[in-house]
Structure formats: structure tokens, C-alpha cells
A protein has these predicted regions:
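Intrinsically disordered, low-complexity regions enriched in Ser/Pro/Gly/Gln/His and often acidic
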Residues: 140, 151-152
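C-terminal regulatory
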Residues: 29-110, 115-140, 157, 161-190
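Short, structured helix-loop boundary elements
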Residues: 4, 153-156
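A short beta-strand structural signal in non-transmembrane regions
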Residues: 143-147
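Short alpha-helical
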Residues: 8-9, 21, 100, 119, ...
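Central regulatory/effector-binding core of bacterial HTH transcription factors
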Residues: 1-30, 178-182, 187-188
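Residue-level signal for short, function-critical loop segments
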Residues: 50, 149-151
Length: 190
């Protein structure tokens, strides 16, 4: 069984025993109960539609951002404290269920936010999105492979070996970059 979770939701699924293995962004909650190995990092860019009022702005601070809507992916955690990434509190935020919806809304000019650079790359190259500099920089996000120790059967061992394969994370980033074309064309990404 494969689940899709976001932000703290993957860690919560592991701790609640709904899954045996996760690939998750950011460090897990304190208290452990799991083993986590970094598998790669992902760069994010702050982007707006080329038609958005912020597209031609200089370096953006909190005051400029306060006048516009942020678009953010919702944390799927049910029990853990929800995690927010790159948001200033008290702002108008449209929360969406997934990164695909976030990209589509940002392409439509409905708001701003950080996007994975490989995912935004095609739209940046064809001019539909513009990268804008912000005072509050988002550091690269580390991704982890994590599991509960002592519960390692043959299937979990196989998946751990497969997901540690050299070059796999880079292949995922390449595939992420390729999904933009299908999203922009209104197709479901594969």
C-alpha cells in the first residue's frame, strides 16, 4: 500500500504505524522511534505568474507580501503539530491539497509561494512564472528515508535497498521537472 502525505503527515503515518517506510521532506519529530537517513536535497524558488503584480518587483519583504495571497500545500498531519514552510503568520493564505494544485494556481496568478525548482523550471524557462527574490530565504530541503527499527522484514529490506539506489533521488528530480509540461497541458502527471 502506498500513501501520499505532505509535510509532517508522512512522519505521523510512520509513527502511527500506517506505513512501514517513508520518503519525507524535513526532519522528523523529536522523540524518535525511527531511523532516518538523508537521501538528497531539493532547492525551492519563490515564484509568481509573469502577470502577477509582484513579478516585476525587486527584493520582496513582509510588507509587500502582506498585500497579496500566499498559496501553500496543506500539512496532512492529523495529530502532530502542522508544519508550515515559507509562510509569514497572519497572511492571506490559500491552502491547497497538493503541489500540482499549487503550481496551477500560481501559474494562473492567484498567489505566490515557494515551489520546488525542478517543478517550476519549465514555467520559468517559458516565461509563465518569474522567480522573485525575497528577504526571507528558504533553505534547501533535505529529504529522508525513514523506518521503525526492529521491524525489518524482507519486503522492507528490499524497499530500503531500492530507495537508496545511487542516482534515484536525482532521477526523481528529473521526473519532477518533466511533470511541468503535463501539468501545464492540463494532463495528469505520471
Amino acid at each position: 500500500r502506498v500513501l501520499s502525505e505532505s509535510l509532517s503527515g508522512g512522519w505521523e503515518a510512520l509513527l502511527d504505524r500506517r506505513v512501514d517506510l517513508i520518503v519525507a521532506a524535513g526532519e522528523g519529530p523529536s522523540g524518535g522511534g525511527y531511523v532516518a537517513e538523508p537521501i538528497g536535497t531539493l532547492r525551492f524558488v519563490f515564484a509568481v505568474a509573469s502577470t502577477h503584480p509582484l513579478a516585476s518587483a525587486g527584493v520582496l519583504g513582509a510588507a509587500e507580501l502582506a498585500e497579496h495571497r500566499a498559496i501553500a500545500v496543506a500539512d496532512s498531519a492529523r495529530r502532530l503539530l502542522p508544519r508550515t514552510v515559507g509562510l509569514l503568520s497572519g497572511r492571506d493564505v490559500l491552502t491547497v491539497p497538493d503541489m500540482r494544485t499549487k503550481l496551477l494556481l500560481q501559474l494562473a496568478g492567484a498567489g505566490y509561494g515557494f515551489l520546488p525548482e525542478p517543478y517550476a523550471r519549465g514555467a520559468l524557462q517559458d516565461g509563465r512564472l518569474r522567480e522573485v527574490q525575497v528577504e526571507t530565504h528558504k533553505p534547501d530541503e533535505t529529504f529522508y528515508l525513514a523506518w521503525r527499527p526492529g521491524e525489518e522484514g524482507e519486503a522492507l529490506g528490499w524497499w530500503r535497498r531500492a530507495l537508496r539506489s545511487e542516482g534515484l533521488f536525482d532521477s526523481w528530480l528529473h521526473a519532477l521537472a518533466a511533470t511541468y509540461r503535463s501539468v501545464a497541458a492540463g494532463q495528469s502527471p505520471r
